[in-house]
């Protein structure tokens, strides 16, 4: 789908707080489109890159809490995870480059997205998730996405680069009009095929 269609659908999904996945080639505007959709839905944006995470990061750090006059040892969310459990602000969490993430970390993400909790600690009801990934054929280090994680999403959107929309966007962002004119003249040049390019 075109970028404008993608942003419109993503905005509706975020407003409804439904988790979803978007896939597309590198540099096609997946993350930027998700940020745009979040802002259109009047939601705070949190971008996370779980490629740098360990599966145990989501469990938290060991600590102690007082319950009913008793001291209990528990795992307490910290950093990003703590923010998700305490925020009251409508928040869209963009899980970026999820296809590059180790499968064990993807499995840990399933609790957040499906159950809305981290090892028994509830995520705020105001939080929703949007996942983004390149495709395996893009040769962007995508090893695949755990099917159970994909099943936690209500839909998978496939973003394609549209030369006309790209040219219009470049003009609105102040890029040289010659670049936009070139893209309109040679629209196929914006479609990078990693498989064929690396075999030349």
Where are these regions (language model features)?
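C-terminal regulatory/interaction module of P-loop NTP-utilizing enzymes
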Residues: 1-200
């Amino acid at each position: 789908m075109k970028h404008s269609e993608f942003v419109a659908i993503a905005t509706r999904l975020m407003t409804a707080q439904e988790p979803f996945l978007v896939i597309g080639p590198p540099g096609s505007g997946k993350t930027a489109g998700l940020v745009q959709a979040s802002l259109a839905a009047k939601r705070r944006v949190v971008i996370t890159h779980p490629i740098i995470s360990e599966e145990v990061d989501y469990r938290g750090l060991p600590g102690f809490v007082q319950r009913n006059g008793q001291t209990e040892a528990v795992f307490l969310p910290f950093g990003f995870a703590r923010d998700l459990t305490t925020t009251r602000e409508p928040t869209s969490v963009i899980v970026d480059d999820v296809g590059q993430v180790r499968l064990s970390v993807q499995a840990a993400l399933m609790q957040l997205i499906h159950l809305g909790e981290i090892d028994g600690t509830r995520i705020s009801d105001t939080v929703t998730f949007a996942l983004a990934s390149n495709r395996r054929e893009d040769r962007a280090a995508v090893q695949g996405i755990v099917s159970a994680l994909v099943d936690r999403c209500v839909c998978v959107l496939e973003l394609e680069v549209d030369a006309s929309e790209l040219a219009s966007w470049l003009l609105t962002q102040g890029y040289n009009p010659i670049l936009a004119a070139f893209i309109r003249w040679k629209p196929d040049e914006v479609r990078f095929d990693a498989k064929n390019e690396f075999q030349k």
